[in-house]
Regions:
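Active-site-adjacent pocket-lining segments in enzyme domains
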Residues: 2-5, 12-13, 19, 26-44, ...
Length: 197
């Protein structure tokens, strides 16, 4: 079973990866196949804390990340502008080179833009103004910016900080985690709930 690795830094936004993890770990729909295993990675194996106060003990650190995995998902939060976040750059470079699924939501999408990873693909973030305010000269992709909750271009998926459900849907599509019908049904269930308006 292939792994999907969630990159978590301190003060990560716990809600941004919750739906993806549940769909991958339990199946997109009840009784659906479970083709992936969720794993977490951080700079070290010391516990990382979320904005909501959850503490996670990472499965991997920078020294023991496996070569064989299906996707690298960068969960947003308050530490993507820190010096320690720079240590994640080689992981993203290798994942893109190896044609893995790579996702970044909220400030993690800004991190991807800061390092030039989004210059040649359609992408989104927390508005183009927010993105430009935080990225440097390596970002030249503003003509590829799309004002949507989440955008998938090939194997690269980005989302703004309120697009966790759309981010989940696009990652499930990129990973071919289930049929299109099951992915859409799951998305609409989480979006609309038991009592759609």
């Amino acid at each position: 079973m292939k792994e999907v690795i969630f990159v978590l830094l301190n003060e990560f936004a716990d809600w941004e990866g919750a739906f993806i993890a549940a769909c991958l770990n339990q199946g997109v729909m009840p009784l659906s196949p479970v083709p992936y295993k969720v794993k977490t990675l951080s700079i070290t194996k010391e516990p990382v804390s979320s904005i909501g106060g959850f503490r996670v003990l990472p499965d991997y650190d920078l020294k023991d990340m496996p070569e064989d995995y299906a996707g690298l998902i960068l969960i947003g939060g308050m530490s993507w502008f820190s010096p320690e976040a720079e240590l994640i750059v080689p992981l993203v470079e290798k994942a893109i080179k190896d044609k893995k699924v790579v996702g970044g939501i909220c400030n993690a999408s800004v991190f991807l833009a800061m390092h030039g990873f989004l210059n040649n693909v359609k992408h989104t973030s927390n508005t183009i103004d927010y993105l430009k305010q935080h990225v440097g000269e390596r970002y030249t992709g503003d003509s590829n910016y799309v004002d949507q909750q989440a955008v998938r271009d090939g194997k690269i998926i980005t989302a703004n900080g309120t697009g966790q459900l759309e981010f989940c849907r696009e990652i499930l599509y990129a990973l071919e985690a289930d049929t299109a019908e099951a992915i859409e049904k799951s998305y609409l269930f989480y979006k609309n709930g038991f009592c759609p308006e």
